[in-house]
Amino acid sequence: MEALKEYTRARDAKKRMFKKAKQELLSFLLRNGKSYPESGNYWTEKFFKWIKTVQFSEKWMQEALNEYLSEVYSLKAKIELMDARIREIAELEIVKDKVDKLICFSGIDVITAVETVVEINDFSRFATAAQFVSYLGLCPGEDSSGKTKNMLPLTKAGNKRVRALFCESAKAIKRTNPYGQKSKRILERQKNASPEIVAYADKATKRIRTKMKHLEERGKNYNVSSAAGARELACFVWGMMNGKIA
């Protein structure tokens, strides 16, 4: 399991490099007066078609652009290759059962499921959902003085990698259809699961989406609502992984 964890972490490192390479490319274009007409809608097929039309009169400027672009393309290709390998990992007996359950949650795709499983491995070592949430650093801190309790920001102690994964998953859940119609993607992921597992995962989706919406309606910022959604998701994941779905 340790080797699988290191491989997925290597993929994460490539993702960070990819993000930086894209930022460097955009900075180069902007400081040299080359602005994408549809600013903000970067990295689409249309964007890459546009960037191929960008030309500089000076040879070295053009070569600089080519280098920035080459780095982006190279990292993109490497990540796609590693993603394919992680999908192969998902079929290994050591992780398959857990991955198949996790992908029933809206917001948790195969890559996220594999990364979660290899990071946590034995979910039963957490006696309660609260222990699991605490391990991920998703519990608010507390400053107690006498009878007064002040809630502080998240402790952010523990496994920051899974915490980040769950925050992104919660954001994805919030974007799902609120009227009960599932996407083809989630239907495909749930098709071989038992009705009990599907019902439990769907319950999680509804609860997380409702909680995040409620918090935002109360004026809480996006990060606060995302953390709350991630906390709920962690509780549901703990239940799923420990057979407590009744």
What is the meaning of each model-derived region?
Residues 136-246:
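A basic, often C-terminal nucleic-acid-binding module that engages the phosphate backbone, implemented
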Residues 26, 87, 103, 117-118, ...:
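Amphipathic alpha-helical segments within well-ordered protein domains
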Residues 100-106, 153-157:
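Cytochrome P450 C-terminal beta-domain/meander region
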Residues 112-128:
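Catalytic palm subdomain of template-directed nucleic-acid polymerases
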Residues 16, 80, 111, 223-224:
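Short, solvent-exposed positions on alpha-helices
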Residues 7-101, 190-191:
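Glycine-rich, often acidic, oxyanion-interacting loops/wings at catalytic, nucleic-acid
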Residues 69, 99, 103, 110-117:
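Short, well-structured alpha-helical segments
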